[in-house]
From Swiss-Prot:
Pathway: Steroid metabolism; ergosterol biosynthesis. It comes from Schizosaccharomyces pombe (strain 972 / ATCC 24843). Sterol 24-C-methyltransferase; part of the third module of ergosterol biosynthesis pathway that includes by the late steps of the pathway. The third module or late pathway involves the ergosterol synthesis itself through consecutive reactions that mainly occur in the endoplasmic reticulum (ER) membrane. Firstly, the squalene synthase erg9 catalyzes the condensation of 2 farnesyl pyrophosphate moieties to form squalene, which is the precursor of all steroids. One of its GO terms (cellular component) is nucleus. GO terms for molecular function: sterol 24-C-methyltransferase activity. The gene is erg6. Belongs to the class I-like SAM-binding methyltransferase superfamily. Erg6/SMT family. It is found in: Nucleus; Endoplasmic reticulum. PROSITE patterns: SAM_MT_ERG6_SMT (PS51685). It catalyses: zymosterol + S-adenosyl-L-methionine = fecosterol + S-adenosyl-L-homocysteine + H(+); lanosterol + S-adenosyl-L-methionine = eburicol + S-adenosyl-L-homocysteine + H(+). This is Sterol 24-C-methyltransferase erg6.
């Protein structure tokens, strides 16, 4: 397969090129932020933050409904703004993982991806779909780990450009294709893929039943779907102010229309026709000394090697100040759009919600579900 067979020119792509320029090909992190079109960046900032009020107590049902209806704009604007900071502060794999003593951050991230592929039973040469593939970190790891042929689906042009660039650098461009598309209306024929997976991506859907239904449709009969889902626990109660504050901080900080509970995810996957083979909240097996959220705490004493210090430092109070002042300097000299530092502030809101959600066990980013499409239609 060739990664050059992408999509015809369209408005989103033109705007993406105007905003990001050649950043997708050559730059990462703060250098990528500095290379963006200032006017277009300002427009994206305004577009994203019009969906949110910083105070969850001011949120209305109409606000939530507007985010759900405008999910494509919410998610696209979010990742146009946050992708570079994710790569700078985390990795090319935009997800969490569990940690074992002595295990480096990068090894933990890769093991988490391998574990999903292993539990799904992905075989060499099979056709696999990655739903919401980000910049392709998990896709590259799973392609190399299993020997599969992979299609990555993403609705963000900037991230697709980065996927293609990285695939070429890793000599995977013959094994991977990245396609622009809405996962609520996938641009694939029925019964196309042997396996479909999603890693912390379908949480951005306005309806889990909707996105799971599309996954069911494009899977071949007997095909397997594996997902790490972001969900609130079944103890979550939106009428409790602290519970709602935690969920809202996760939503506003991560571009999520609306968080749901574990039971809602299970109901959705069964309702579209899947046979649910396995469900397991992997945070239940967490190392209490190294919880999944420890890199967000900025506690470098928990780092398992010297290289992890750099990752964890960026989430510390001092690390966030360094990033904020660096971005504010770029704003001051006119290289970055005014308000760009607000993106970092938004990620800090998410950081607070994720840590509190982890500490209270009200939230998990790794609710594993493995499901199978029946061999024949019911």
């Amino acid at each position: 397969m060739s990664s050059t067979a992408l999509l015809p020119p369209n408005t989103d792509q033109v705007l993406s090129r105007r905003l990001h320029g050649k950043a997708a090909e050559k730059k990462t992190g703060l250098a990528a932020i500095a290379s963006k079109d200032v006017d277009e960046q300002s427009r994206k900032l305004q577009e994203y933050f019009e969906f949110w009020d910083r105070n969850h107590e001011n949120e209305s049902e109409e606000d939530r409904a507007r985010r759900i209806d405008g999910y494509k704009s919410v998610v696209n604007s979010y990742y146009d703004l946050a992708t570079d900071l994710y790569e700078y502060g985390w990795s090319q794999s935009f997800h969490f993982s569990r940690f074992y003593k002595g295990e480096a951050f990068a090894q933990s991230i890769a093991r988490h991806e391998h574990y999903l592929a292993y539990r799904m039973g992905i075989k060499p040469g099979s056709r696999v779909l990655d739903v919401g593939c980000g910049v392709g970190g998990p896709a590259r790891e799973i392609t190399e780990f299993t020997g599969c042929n992979l299609v990555g689906l993403n609705n963000n042009d900037y991230q697709i450009s980065r996927c293609n660039n990285y695939a070429v650098k890793r000599n995977l461009d013959k094994k991977q294709v990245f396609v622009k598309g809405d996962f609520m209306h996938m641009p694939f024929e029925d019964n196309t893929f042997d396996y479909v997976y999603a890693i912390e991506a379908t949480v951005h859907a306005p309806s889990l039943e909707g996105v799971y239904g599309e996954i069911f449709r494009v899977l071949k009969p007997g095909g397997v779907f594996g997902v790490y889902e972001w969900v609130m626990s079944d103890d979550y109660d939106s009428s409790i102010p602290k519970h709602r504050e935690i969920a809202y901080n996760i939503e506003v900080g991560d571009g999520i229309p609306q968080m749901v509970r574990k039971c809602d995810a299970v109901e959705a996957i069964k309702k579209v026709g899947f046979n649910l083979l396995e469900e397991d909240d992997l945070t239940d097996h967490d190392n209490p000394d190294l919880p999944w959220y420890y890199p967000l705490t900025g506690d470098i004493t928990k780092c398992q090697n010297i290289w992890d210090v750099f990752t964890v430092f960026r989430t510390s109070r001092l690390g966030k100040l360094v990033t904020r002042y660096s971005v504010q300097f770029l704003e001051k000299i006119g290289v970055a759009a005014k308000g760009t530092s607000k993106v970092g502030d938004t990620l800090a809101i998410a950081q607070k919600g994720l840590i509190e959600g982890g500490e209270t066990h009200l939230f998990t980013p790794m609710f594993l579900m493995i499901a199978k499409k029946p061999e024949t239609d019911a």
